[in-house]
């Protein structure tokens, strides 16, 4: 009985749904007719001047210089447009002429077989204006489709530290290649969300950054949390999916049988809708629990990191202190070695000085000794001279005595006396005696005996060989 009521209720609800579906189809057909009428209208004329565009109704003048922001880079991937539904016979020159109103085009590419192309304008603002004005414009029986081209060299950066700005993000990723744009995503209050976008000028730089950051740990600040890099999801949040682009197949018509509505309580739709809501709620709760677990794990890791950082700093300070102590010890050893070397050098210098002084003293003594020996060799000393004079005196006395006993040799008259010492010698016949000296008393005694016949000397002197008193020393 209850099932019949449910069936009747669904049957009653199905009747107005079909009526609403019929009105929806009629509204859709009216929209298609209006679009066809707009396509049949001639396109607005495109001025040849690329610096300004004037409207017949409003008379607007566009200065292209005003659409460039200060410091904005030109001809980037963000100003690249995709143009679809192109005629198969369109040329590159016609493509440039179509967009010359919006400034000089930097890049033009046409794929005639597939009927699409790409064009790059100077700035993002000019590309947006061209997109709005040329989208859905009829050209040779086809309706142009203008969209922003997908940026294949853009990356999403996660786990950004709190104090990372756009400039720092661009500077950090510029090591991989030329960066066209780097943005740190913030919330409605301007607080960083920990995510960012980096757009490179080419795919090789983006691939290099993706590989390097995946293999290693890329740090942007002192906080040792590495960033994660992944390809950016190309999502169109501006145009979305218009009705005219939806594929009208059998599944489309089946889904569009029911209009937007609230499920009636107690119905089949309501029962399974509630089950779907329970599943979504469970997913949300589990996601919240996962987020809480991750948050707790992050806080715990940050606390451990701070403790480890403090310990690491203490260890570094200890190592630095030990290094400085070792350096001081090494410097002290070097100083001691230098002092020892200096002392040894001073000792060697002192020893060398003493040796030189000793050598000089020896040389002086040797020189004096040689001088004395040379003086003695030339002039005999007083003692030797006395001995020699004594011997000469004794020999002279003996000669005089002998001459007194012998007759004188006859000398012829007129013969001069012989020169030399013999002429100076005293003659016994004349009764002359040589003068006596105190030192040669023996010779005087002998001379007196021989010449005068025993006259005593001036003072009694013992003969040679006589013994002296005990306290007297013998003189030679």
From Swiss-Prot:
Bias type Basic residues, positions: 14-27
Composition-biased stretches (Polar residues): 1-10
Positions bearing Omega-N-methylarginine: 461
Domain RRM: 80-147, 154-235
Alphabetized UniProt keyword annotations: Acetylation, Activator, Biological rhythms, Chromosome, Coiled coil, DNA damage, DNA recombination, DNA repair, DNA-binding, Immunity, Innate immunity, Isopeptide bond, Methylation, mRNA processing, mRNA splicing, Nucleus, Phosphoprotein, Repeat, Repressor, RNA-binding, Transcription, Transcription regulation, Ubl conjugation
Record GO cellular component, one term: paraspeckles
Cross-link annotation Glycyl lysine isopeptide (Lys-Gly) (interchain with G-Cter in SUMO2), location: 5, 65, 101, 104, 131, 195, 203, 248, 254, 376, 472
Principal place of residence: nucleus
A Pfam family the protein falls into: NOPS
Keyword Nucleus: yes
Residues the record lists as Phosphothreonine modifications: 6, 433, 445, 455
Subcellular location: Nucleus; Nucleus, Nucleolus; Nucleus speckle; Chromosome
PROSITE patterns in UniProt: RRM (PS50102)
Claim: Phosphoprotein is one of the keywords in the record: yes
Chain segments annotated as coiled-coil in the UniProt record: 274-378
Modified residues (Phosphoserine): 152, 267
Subunit structure: Monomer and component of the SFPQ-NONO complex, which is probably a heterotetramer of two 52 kDa (NONO) and two 100 kDa (SFPQ) subunits. NONO is a component of spliceosome and U5.4/6 snRNP complexes. Interacts with CPNE4 (via VWFA domain). Forms heterodimers with PSPC1; this involves formation of a coiled coil domain by helices from both proteins. Part of complex consisting of SFPQ, NONO and MATR3. Part of a complex consisting of SFPQ, NONO and NR5A1. Part of a complex consisting of SFPQ, NONO and TOP1. Interacts with SPI1 and SPIB. Interacts with RNF43. Interacts with PER1 and PER2.
Full protein name: Non-POU domain-containing octamer-binding protein
Organism: Rattus norvegicus (Rat)
Gene, per the UniProt record: Nono
């Amino acid at each position: 009985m209850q099932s019949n009521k449910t069936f009747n209720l669904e049957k009653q609800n199905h009747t107005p749904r079909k009526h609403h579906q019929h009105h929806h189809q009629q509204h859709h057909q009216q929209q298609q007719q209006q679009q066809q009428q707009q396509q049949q209208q001639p396109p607005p004329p495109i001025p040849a001047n690329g610096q300004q565009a004037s409207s017949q109704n409003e008379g607007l003048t566009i200065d292209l210089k005003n659409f460039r922001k200060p410091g904005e880079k030109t001809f980037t991937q963000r100003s690249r447009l995709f143009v679809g539904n192109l005629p198969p016979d369109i040329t590159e020159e016609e493509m440039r002429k179509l967009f010359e109103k919006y400034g000089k085009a930097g890049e033009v590419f046409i794929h005639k077989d597939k009927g699409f192309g790409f064009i790059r304008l100077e700035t993002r603002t000019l590309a947006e204006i061209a997109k709005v004005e040329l989208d859905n414009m009829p050209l040779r029986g086809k309706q142009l489709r203008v969209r922003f081209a997908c940026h294949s060299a853009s990356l999403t950066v996660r786990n950004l530290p709190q104090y990372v700005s756009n400039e720092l993000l661009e500077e950090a990723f510029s090591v991989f290649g030329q960066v066209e744009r780097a943005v740190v995503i913030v919330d409605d209050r301007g607080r960083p969300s920990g995510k960012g976008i980096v757009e490179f000028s080419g795919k090789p730089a983006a691939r290099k950054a993706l590989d390097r950051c995946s293999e290693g740990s890329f740090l942007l600040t002192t906080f040792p949390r590495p960033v994660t890099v992944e390809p950016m999801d190309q999502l169109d949040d501006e145009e979305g999916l218009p009705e005219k682009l939806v594929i009208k197949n059998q599944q489309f018509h089946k889904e569009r049988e029911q209009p937007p509505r609230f499920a009636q309580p107690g119905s089949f739709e309501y029962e399974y809708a509630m089950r779907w809501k329970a599943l979504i709620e469970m997913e949300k709760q589990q996601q919240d629990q996962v987020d809480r677990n991750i948050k707790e794990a992050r806080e715990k890791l940050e606390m451990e990191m701070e403790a480890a950082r403090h310990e690491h700093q203490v260890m570094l300070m200890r190592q630095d202190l030990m290094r400085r102590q070792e350096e001081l010890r090494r410097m002290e050893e070097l100083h001691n070695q230098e002092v020892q070397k200096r002392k040894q050098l001073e000792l060697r210098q002192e020893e060398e000085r003493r040796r030189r002084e000793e050598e000089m003293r020896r040389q002086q003594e040797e020189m004096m000794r040689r001088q004395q020996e040379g003086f003695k060799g030339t002039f005999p000393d007083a003692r030797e001279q006395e001995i020699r004079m004594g011997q000469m005196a004794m020999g002279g006395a003996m000669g005089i005595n002998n001459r007194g006993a012998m007759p004188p040799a006859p000398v012829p008259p007129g013969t001069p006396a012989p020169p030399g010492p013999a002429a100076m010698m005293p003659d016994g016949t004349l009764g002359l005696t040589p003068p006596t000296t105190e030192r040669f008393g023996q010779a005087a005694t002998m001379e007196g005996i021989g010449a005068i016949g025993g006259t005593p000397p001036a003072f009694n002197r013992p003969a040679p060989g006589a013994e002296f008193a005990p306290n007297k020393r013998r003189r030679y």
